[in-house]
Amino acid sequence: VTSAVCHLVVGPRKHGVVEYAISVHDALVHGALAHGGRVDFGTDHRCAFLESPDAELPPLDCSLVHIHVTDRLFGRTPGEATERFSALVDALGTDVSVTLHDLPQPSDGAAMQARAEFYRTVVRVAAGVIVSSEHETALLQNVVDDSIVPAMVPLMIGTRPPRRRLSTPTAPTVGVLGFLYPGKGHIETLRAMEDLPISVGFVALGTPSPGHEYLADELRGVAARTGRRIEITGFLGDEELERRIHEVTVPVAYHRHLSASGSINTWIAQGRKPLVPRGGYITELDDRSPGVVSIHADDDGSLRHAIASAIDDSTSTWIDTSVEPVPSPSDVAAAYDEHLTRWTR
């Protein structure tokens, strides 16, 4: 008998965690439809959407509901998020499993304890817990609840398209991908360009996250003082984002407190090899999938040197065609199917 898992996707479609939740379900469906239509997975994976956690629930007929969770999708504060998540679980009335994102860590400062309390509430009601890196496993056990042993399924790296030979832009650019928010590294990257020729522009592929619109003004202010070209693209659709990722001369992901990163994987999925600071998660990523990132020491001076070197040799910012990034969508689908099927029993 086929059991059903409902992937309940909570939040606005443009949010990174929501996009990832959809991509996991898509991979499960495509995996199930592979090989001439034969269903490979014994579990029926369905999908339902909630624009917000207190929206009206669609009818679900499932033995397990799986939700991708970050506190910011459930409330403006961790306390509000806890109330709304708990109310949703009560309304579902069935077993719930979760994938945790953006786990609390010491770099959160004063917010860490309240955020940890939210995640504690989540894991204590969950029939199963997935995280996306060993680094996140350590955060979960050190900061949230040391009794939880999660399943670890790394973030998928989309299928890499054939490398495009674009004509080199007349003026080179350094690019940062994703929402603008504190700690993402936009300002630090722009400042690290101060020794570069003024002809090298800075581009932020994305839009400020809610409440952080001031960061765009800060970036423009720093650029204006040095006379450097700057562009903040705003939200980009898939095709436009793909084109812009290929146009950037030097991709940079100077996010100092990573526990897993969708934006790094987006660069990689397009054949780019971003500059990244050495750290626990980056070491794990490099061990699992060698040759997909360019690692420098975790300080501003090393970033400055790495950018200058990449401007001089832009071929270093493309993944060698012999490298096959892992895990693929089908790898991730198989792992999710295994864990979710186990938790339905």
What are these regions (language model features)?
Residues 19, 181-195, 265:
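A conserved mid-protein helix/loop that constitutes part of the nucleotide-sugar donor-binding site
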Residues 85-91, 111-128:
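Membrane-proximal helix-turn-helix segments that form the acceptor-binding/catalytic region
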Residues 124-162:
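Donor nucleotide-sugar binding/catalytic pocket of nucleotide-sugar-dependent glycosyltransferases
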Residues 201-217, 234:
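Glycosyltransferase donor-sugar binding loop
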Residues 216-242:
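Nucleotide-activated donor-binding/catalytic signature segment of Leloir-type glycosyltransferases, i.e.
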Residues 243-259, 272:
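Acidic donor-binding loop of glycosyltransferase active sites
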Residues 273-278, 283:
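Short hydrophobic beta-strand element within catalytic cores of glycosyltransferases
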Residues 298, 304, 311-344:
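A charged, aromatic-enriched C-terminal amphipathic alpha-helix characteristic of glycosyltransferases
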